[in-house]
């Protein structure tokens, strides 16, 4: 686990998490103490004889491994609470003992923990709790609880569960390193306990949300049953039945509100984070295992899965569509003036930009669906790679810690320090996640090298008379090969990318995505023009294409051999032509790649508290910030500020400023089009509303408002 959950200075004044010692005044206890009296009754299947036994009475019959007998005796001699403060003591022996019990008898973690020590480890259960009983009252008209009261009960219950889960995870962290002849066996025993704790934490962290959802579903069933009863009810009973139905509808509204509030609450976030801590060992193991399925020569599958659709896409939109449009306009619109050149650039860019987004949104989902349909995704490992979830592998820090074996609450300063540490670690991981994409300097350079290199090779082969490299198909194929090489390079980087956590574990940054694709959903995600975000993407691609074409058209033409001349061009002319071919490709792609990252950059800027001041111009604001604040943390960086005295970071900042300069004119135009788009749609909606024929109910309501009808 990440060490920041335990961290904090040793000499600070402590806030106690629990209070069970008779000699300590109650006011020194932690306000969210998890005492025995706060725990709900056990469910029937958990209230066996072990629940009523004391630790001393039950421990004699605990089925631990023979090698753990002395450990059990030492555990029995421990104090459950600190002698002075009354805070719970974190046992370094308990996790191994629970694992030993679980190996002998596979029961849920919460049952076995209580079996080890009922006084110390009676865990908080949703089943049978006051909270569950209170939620059940929502289905009883006339007994519906107060929303604020239930909300506080939910909050307190969630805090208690999170405290207990943190206690148990800290208990596992406190287990000493296994040594001696039983080291391997004890390590496996600890892993059993850790896995069981993770499973319990998963259930416990979801119990409140599932309980609320079940209560809402139960109310729906009651309402449906009442609707059936009302159909056959006598007239005299209908009034009371309608009242009961309305009470249930109101109760459902309250529960839906409580559920929505809880899902967004800090308590729910903390529960999810604590559960992630308890499951982290298994999550990392699963990620490593999954990555190993595409390790070595098996990595050819993901590379092909990325290269083939990118080859088809690049050959189509960068090759055939853009170049055929350019060739057609060259014959149609003579280059007589700058206006004619701008007109051609506008047409070529708009067509190519729209084609770029359309083809990418169609080809890749269809190719992935075809792989899954034929089974090649599994047989040949032809699966895409996806980034791991940052918050899952780097959860929020704990609020509690172990201080000399006592469970205590961290001070606000310690919490702030740990949060800053987690934030910095997440930034490192997020940098690795975007490093291979075309929205990162490294990823962009890969793409520029691949596309520029393929066009340079095509031009060279043409100039030395090996191929006719000026045909439409030759240029389109070169674009396709560039796309394939770019996608292959980026996938290869993803296959090798790892994040090393503070404990030295190597965690894969990308993992194979074997989830079943939904072709219709995937196509709509990029092609549903009813969505403002999709339309904005098309606007950005079209306007980026115009700017790209304008930049490319400013380049001088390649040197061609005079008609009827024999031999080949000079070496200098060939090198110049290769450079021009590569530069033309890079100049066109630079604006496209720069602008396609604006959406993510705007979101990151807003999350960092630096954006959102002008929502109508948020894309322009992002471009300006890239020029004015290229060193900000929300931008992807390859180098840290301290690397080589900051010199590489200065060069990278200049790179981001250049990107911002390319983004600014395009995104100003995009924001303008967005405003016009929104205005037109609002005007159309208003016109439709105005033309809509009034209904009889509308006429009656208007007459009632004007006093023409008497209310009944």
From Swiss-Prot:
Species of the source: Pseudomonas syringae pv. tomato (strain ATCC BAA-871 / DC3000)
The UniProt function text for this chain reads: Involved in the suppression of basal resistance and promotion of disease symptoms in plants. Mediates the ubiquitination and degradation, via the host proteasome, of a low-abundance immunity-associated protein in Arabidopsis thaliana. May be involved in the inhibition of a host vesicle trafficking pathway.
Give the protein's recorded name: Effector protein HopM1
Q: Tell me, how does this one assemble?
A: Interacts with the chaperone ShcM. Interacts with host plant BIG5/ATMIN7.
According to the record, the residues making up region (Disordered) are: 22-58
The UniProt entry's GO CC annotations, sorted and at most eight, read: extracellular region; host cell membrane; membrane
Name the major location: secreted
Q: What induces it?
A: Transcriptionally induced by HrpL.
Q: Which gene encodes it?
A: hopM1
State where the protein is found. Secreted; Host membrane
Judging by the UniProt lineage, the source's domain of life is Bacteria
Keywords carried by this UniProt record? Host membrane, Membrane, Secreted, Virulence
* Residue spans of biased composition, Polar residues class: 44-57
**Quick check: keyword GTP-binding in the entry?**
no
């Amino acid at each position: 686990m990440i060490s920041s959950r335990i961290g904090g200075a040793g000499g600070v004044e402590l806030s106690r998490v629990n209070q069970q010692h008779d000699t300590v005044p109650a006011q020194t206890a932690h306000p969210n103490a998890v005492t025995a009296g706060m725990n709900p009754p056990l469910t029937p299947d958990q209230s066996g004889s072990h629940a009523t036994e004391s630790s001393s009475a039950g421990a004699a019959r605990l089925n631990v491994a023979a090698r753990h007998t002395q450990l059990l005796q030492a555990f029995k001699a421990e104090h459950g609470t600190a002698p002075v403060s009354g805070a719970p003591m974190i046992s370094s022996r308990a996790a191994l003992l629970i694992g030993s019990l679980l190996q002998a008898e596979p029961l849920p973690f919460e049952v076995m923990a209580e079996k080890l020590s009922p006084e110390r480890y009676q865990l908080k259960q949703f089943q049978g709790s006051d909270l569950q009983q209170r939620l059940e009252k929502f289905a009883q008209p006339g007994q519906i609880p107060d929303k604020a009261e239930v909300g506080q009960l939910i909050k307190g219950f969630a805090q208690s569960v999170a405290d207990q889960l943190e206690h148990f995870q800290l208990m596992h962290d406190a287990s000493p390193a296994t040594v001696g002849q039983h080291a391997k066996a004890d390590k496996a025993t600890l892993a059993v306990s850790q896995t069981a704790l993770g499973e319990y934490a998963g259930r416990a962290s979801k119990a409140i949300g599932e309980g609320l959802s079940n209560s809402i579903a139960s109310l729906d069933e009651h309402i449906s049953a009442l609707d059936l009863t009302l159909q056959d009810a006598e007239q005299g009973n209908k009034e009371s039945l309608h009242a009961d139905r309305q009470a249930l509808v109101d109760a459902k509204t309250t529960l839906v509100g409580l559920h929505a509030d809880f899902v967004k609450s800090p308590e729910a976030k903390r529960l999810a984070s604590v559960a992630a801590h308890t499951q982290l060992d298994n999550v990392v193991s699963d990620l490593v295992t999954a990555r190993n399925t595409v390790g070595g020569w098996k990595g050819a599958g993901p590379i092909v899965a990325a290269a083939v659709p990118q080859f088809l896409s690049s050959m189509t939109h960068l090759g055939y569509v853009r170049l055929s449009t350019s060739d057609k306009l060259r014959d149609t619109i003579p280059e007589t003036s700058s206006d004619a050149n701008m007109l051609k650039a506008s047409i070529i860019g708009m067509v190519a930009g729209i084609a770029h987004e359309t083809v990418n949104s169609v080809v890749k989902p269809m190719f992935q669906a075809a792989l899954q349909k034929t089974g090649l995704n599994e047989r040949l490992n032809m699966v895409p790679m996806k980034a791991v979830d940052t918050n899952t592998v780097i959860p929020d820090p704990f609020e509690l810690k172990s201080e000399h074996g006592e469970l205590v609450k961290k001070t606000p300063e310690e919490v702030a320090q740990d949060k800053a540490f987690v934030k910095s670690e997440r930034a490192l991981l997020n940098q690795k996640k975007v490093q291979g994409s075309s929205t990162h300097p490294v990823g962009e350079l890969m793409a520029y090298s691949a596309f520029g290199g393929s066009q340079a090779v095509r031009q060279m082969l043409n100039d030395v008379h090996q191929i006719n490299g000026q045909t439409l198909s030759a240029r389109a194929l070169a674009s396709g090969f560039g796309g394939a090489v770019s996608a292959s390079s980026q996938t290869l980087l993803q296959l090798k990318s790892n994040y090393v956590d503070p404990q030295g574990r190597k965690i894969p940054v990308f993992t194979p995505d074997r989830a079943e694709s939904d072709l219709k959903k995937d196509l709509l995600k990029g092609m549903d023009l009813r969505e403002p975000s999709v339309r904005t993407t098309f606007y950005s691609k079209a306007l980026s294409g115009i700017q790209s074409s304008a930049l490319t058209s400013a380049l001088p033409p390649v040197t061609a051999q005079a008609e009827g001349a024999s031999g080949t061009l000079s070496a200098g002319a060939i090198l110049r032509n290769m450079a021009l071919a590569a530069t033309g490709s890079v100049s066109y792609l630079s604006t496209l790649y720069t602008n396609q990252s604006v959406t993510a950059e705007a979101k990151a800027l807003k999350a960092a508290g630096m954006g959102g001041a002008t929502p109508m111009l948020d894309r322009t604001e992002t471009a300006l910030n890239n020029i004015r604040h290229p060193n900000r943390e929300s931008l992807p960086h390859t180098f840290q500020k301290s690397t080589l005295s900051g010199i590489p970071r200065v060069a990278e900042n200049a790179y981001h400023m250049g990107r911002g300069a390319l983004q600014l004119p395009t995104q100003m135009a995009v924001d303008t089009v967005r405003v016009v788009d929104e205005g037109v749609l609002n005007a159309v909606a208003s016109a439709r509303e105005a033309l809509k024929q009034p209904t009889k109910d509308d006429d009656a309501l208007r007459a009632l408002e004007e006093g023409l009808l008497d209310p009944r």
